[in-house]
């Protein structure tokens, strides 16, 4: 997930009413048994939720068997169990479908299993492994593969394996014939309008959904596109996500939004130089790198990062065919704004693993060494040795910077 400093929401007002205390019948025999959290302002200690959120879970009655689809976070187990018990005796539950095992969806699972020990948890192989390390006790489990089904008597559930949306364990559950897709985190949003659980009861939440996508799914764009391909030819009349409103009006709109946000942008080769320079020395080096990289067929732009927003920086990281960082040492460390940039690397879908490093220092010079370790740890290749300058760069250092820019630029173009 993306830290709070990496995502800045542009969205809007919040309505306050009483939260939903009871269950909601979505379709005959299909119930919402989730929990509303309209006051939440930071999700998982990581990013802002101006509109709160919901933890959606569902109970499905068949002619012969009963299934629960996902649970809620552990702190809301009492409310959750009250809703379950208002519909069925827990010991009569046959299946617990775990589409995703992150604690906001599995936190109540351990307690639920105590109430229905004969129930079978249905999940992917990865989810079974994760649950073993979350529950630390035995449980009945049925591992499913792509296309497997479960029959509830007059209703059938089909499972669609979609890893890394946004954990390795994720799957969709489709209620066949009724064309309802349970997607856990995918296609949802952190949005709660208390007492209103359907998307046609609330304002358009496209901004909230985009912000949610940006914070959670942006590093997994290829996986989003693969998942959309798996359901492209299915009839879908309703999407039941784990966060935000149930999408019964125009469900394909949410899918198409996720797909559009995940598609790559192609507009020629780009090399970006990102630097910070309190005293102008690293900036002189950045100018030299840019001169060296300025060859036909490549767009080269140098950015002082203090002039850019976090969203602008993340866009640049994602679009680049090569990244060259200019980092001075300040108090034996990388300056915080540049640490933030290096942290953003894990929050986007990168198309390059080629990087360069340069920077100035006065007497210790740790910053470039730290950055080199960070980049190599993320799988980046540095085809040119790091260039460092003690205070003001000499003519020889400037020449090395120009050569760095030229060498990396030529490498980008040679890759085609």
What are these regions (language model features)?
Residues 193, 203-239, 243-246, 288-303, ...:
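FMN-binding flavodoxin-like domain, especially the glycine-rich phosphate-binding loop
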Residues 24-28, 123-170, 220, 226-228:
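Metallo-beta-lactamase
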């Amino acid at each position: 997930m993306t830290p709070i400093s990496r995502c800045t929401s542009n969205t809007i007002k919040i309505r306050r009413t009483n939260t939903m205390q009871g269950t909601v019948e979505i379709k005959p025999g299909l119930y919402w048994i989730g929990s509303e959290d309209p006051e939440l302002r930071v999700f998982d200690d990581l990013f802002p939720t101006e509109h709160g959120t919901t933890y959606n879970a569902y109970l499905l009655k068949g002619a012969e068997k009963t299934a629960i689809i996902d649970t809620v976070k552990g702190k809301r187990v009492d409310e959750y169990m009250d809703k379950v018990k208002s519909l069925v005796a827990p010991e009569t539950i046959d299946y617990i479908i775990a589409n995703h095992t992150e604690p906001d969806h599995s936190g109540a699972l351990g307690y639920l299993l105590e109430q229905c020990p004969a129930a079978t948890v249905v999940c992917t192989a990865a989810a079974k492994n994760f649950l073993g390390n979350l529950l630390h006790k035995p449980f009945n489990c049925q591992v499913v593969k792509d296309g497997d089904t479960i029959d509830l008597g007059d209703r059938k559930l089909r499972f669609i394996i979609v890893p890394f949306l946004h954990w390795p364990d994720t799957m969709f559950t489709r209620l066949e014939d009724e064309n309802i897709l349970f997607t856990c985190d995918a296609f949802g949003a952190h949005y709660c309008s208390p007492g209103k659980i359907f998307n046609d009861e609330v304002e358009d939440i496209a901004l909230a959904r985009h912000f949610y996508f940006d914070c959670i799914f942006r590093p997994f764009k290829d996986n989003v596109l693969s998942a959309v391909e798996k359901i492209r030819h299915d009839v879908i009349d309703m999407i039941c996500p784990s966060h935000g409103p149930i999408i019964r009006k125009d469900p394909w709109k949410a899918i198409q939004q996720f797909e559009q946000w995940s598609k790559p942008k192609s507009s020629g080769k780009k090399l970006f130089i990102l630097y910070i320079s309190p005293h102008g020395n690293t900036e002189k080096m950045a100018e030299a790198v840019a001169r060296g990289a300025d060859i036909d067929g490549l767009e080269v732009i140098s950015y002082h990062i203090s002039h850019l927003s976090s969203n602008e920086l993340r866009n640049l990281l994602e679009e680049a065919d090569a990244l060259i960082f200019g980092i001075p040492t300040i108090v034996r460390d990388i300056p915080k704004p540049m640490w933030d940039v290096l942290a953003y690397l894990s929050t986007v879908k990168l198309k390059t693993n080629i990087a360069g490093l340069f920077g100035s220092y006065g007497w210790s010079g740790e910053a470039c060494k730290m950055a080199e370790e960070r980049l190599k740890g993320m799988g980046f290749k540095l085809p040119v040795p790091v260039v460092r300058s003690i205070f003001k760069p000499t003519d020889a250092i400037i020449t090395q910077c120009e050569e760095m820019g030229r060498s990396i630029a030529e490498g980008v173009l040679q890759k085609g």
